Amino acid sequence: MRNIALFLTYEGTGYHGWQMQKNLATVQQTLEKAIAMVVAHPVHVTGCGRTDAGVHAKCYVANFRTTSTIPSERLPYALNTHLPADIVVTKAFDVHENFNAIGSCARKEYTYIIYNSRLKDPFYVNRAWFYPKYLDEKIMQEAAQQFVGTHDFAAVRSVGTDVKSTVRTVYYYDVERQGDLIYLRVCANGFLYNMARAMAGTVVYAAEGKIRPEQISEILDSGNRTAAGPTVPPGGLYMTHLWYDDGIAKFQCPE
């Protein structure tokens, strides 16, 4: 039985997230259906994370097992003929039998995009969060820096989600403006449910003057979700980089 890893990219507007849901279109469901048509047997696809409804992926890693002998380099072309235009497989390769797209992942980067202009741009609908009031990226960077390090991130996750631990390590959180677009890039060893979007909302809170950047440390210590900023809309969020280095596999997506 072969274990095959896939690199894919998708525009998530038309999907109810990654994970399979009954009677709803999801990326996992769509991908599994396409793979089954190519390899001629049902498959279960493991993804590197559960992106929410409307969230996009510039690069996403998944893996599945198959008895098919089709060469891995031919798989992207075969799969893409059965996939809709908003999901594209860019690479396929054989991996160790113990490789797991989520369990083997060491770090992930998400990028949140804000369209910061007084006028909307129709080409960024569902691709960036339109925010008409001017945001000072220097204040945003000062706020973002407060998240870097190992902390309990319970204050920036969805209330009611059940996990063993809410402690995570954030390696960097960078804010960059390019014209009317503001990019918030955050890398961590893992993300809680809605954590990246709640962090972005808290950074915007600081730029709005609703909290001081240095208060973010206190908010994290409190674990109080209501003290942090809002969970910003999903359309501005992209999975943008993944790192694998667990002794089983060592690669990055994108390469």
Segments (PLM) and residue ranges:
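Structured-RNA-binding interfaces characteristic of tRNA pseudouridine synthases
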Residues: M1-E255
